[in-house]
Amino acid sequence: MSAAGSPVIPDNEGGMQPPKKIVRGSHRVMAASGRVPNRLVFGRRMLSTSGGANESASVRFSPLLAPVVRAVRKYHPDEDIQVLQRAFEIANKYHEGQKRKSGDPYITHPVAVTAILAEMGATGPVLAAGLLHDTVEDTEYTMEELTEEFGEEVAYLVDGVTKLDKMTYGEHASIETIRKLVLSMSKDIRVLLIKLADRLHNARTWRFVAAGSAARKAEETLKIYAPLAHRLGLNTIKWELEDLSFAAMSPEIYAEIVRMVGERTPKLEKFLDESRSKITERLDSVGLEATVTGRPKHYYSIHQKMKTKGRSFDEINDILAVRIMVETDEQCYTVLGHILSLWPAMPGRFKDYIKNPKNNNYQSLHLTVYGPGNLPLEIQIRTYKMHEEAEYGVAAHWRYKAASRGEKITQQKHEPGAHTSAMNVGILQSIAEISNSNPESDKFYESLAETLDTDEIVVLTPDGEAIALPAGSTPVDFAYAIHSEVGDRTVGAKVNGRLVPLHTVLP
């Protein structure tokens, strides 16, 4: 679609308002070595060092890009986003004539993927890669052309996603091995985030795919991509992937749970409103500013609880949870005291994930009380920063960038730690180095660094069996790892579908 006839999108169009006052900050962003300069990121024809937000404000964008542009201007108003229209034009040109199973033009898929990334707070290179992620694999557009047009950084990200798409696992490969393989191929976490956004949009359109095919993809998603999203702290994406997978794999059970939750909704909403009112009234009376929201458990979560606890739907009492967000850690514990003065706590249901974070960096206070009517009420207490990290995990650093410049940000005020500030500048050259730079760094980042910085590679046989080898191994080493006789008889090798010399270092 030509940019010439497209409408101008106003600077301040759209954008969800935060549930409380707009929070501003003036936090310093720590620099890190290895950042690809802007002039190399997008190619010399695409980006100038002058202009910035004012220059991009006058650019005409395709209407399809409106959600992307709104999100970028919300989180990164100074970002030069002219490259997005050019990336869209290239993707639209090369995907022309291609259709989704839904019958929609194929271009709607990369645009939707990019919109998901933009709502995470992603910046230019990631967004351009989101728009272009299927061009090299599915069209005649070459990696050389992409590199020339958009620079090495965008090409690197697209190449990483393409390699993930080409992976075949084999029916005998263990789930943990596949997860490790996916992570090992995603040396830059941004590649994995693009892949997760890609899988999420595909999952949203499974209803247009044959039931059997959708169920197989859903099982793969539930076993591989949802846990990876959880490990990266991307709970918003994890929950949606789980619900969509559940709906595709067990449509009748899913529909029944949706129906039962719907029948309970009026009663649940009344209970929730009463609980929130009491909490808000108490906190207001002591001058403690907080945001109090309610959320239902996700359908898959309800199903899992019924399954693991051996309970019927009517025996699941904590379908709703109240979430309380405040500014500081100290205020979290102050709120806890007020909650316990309102209602008695249910024994054995208190968890302090602030002092003892989960492995994926999740932090909150969890407790269950006997709320109004003596009914169980699950309560979560966290800071705005903890909430952002709980929702967006490793992607939250993109939003920190906006906070660090004093731009408006949704729901939180941040004091970025060393690891999050370092991630602001882009490429994660060494997660281990980032972790070591901060003695307080969370266990999750150390664990992920071990996974991604490993000196071991995982190679799959044609039957899907996983073989762990030292980095630098060749096809001959792989053959002998299978069996000495296989190694003795090896005369050729094929890696990722291509014949290679026996001395080739395995990727």
Predicted feature descriptions by range:
Residues 2-377, 382-450, 459-465, 507:
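Active-site helical microenvironments for divalent-metal-assisted chemistry
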Residues 435-507:
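Ubiquitin-like/PB1-type beta-grasp interaction modules and other compact soluble beta-rich domains
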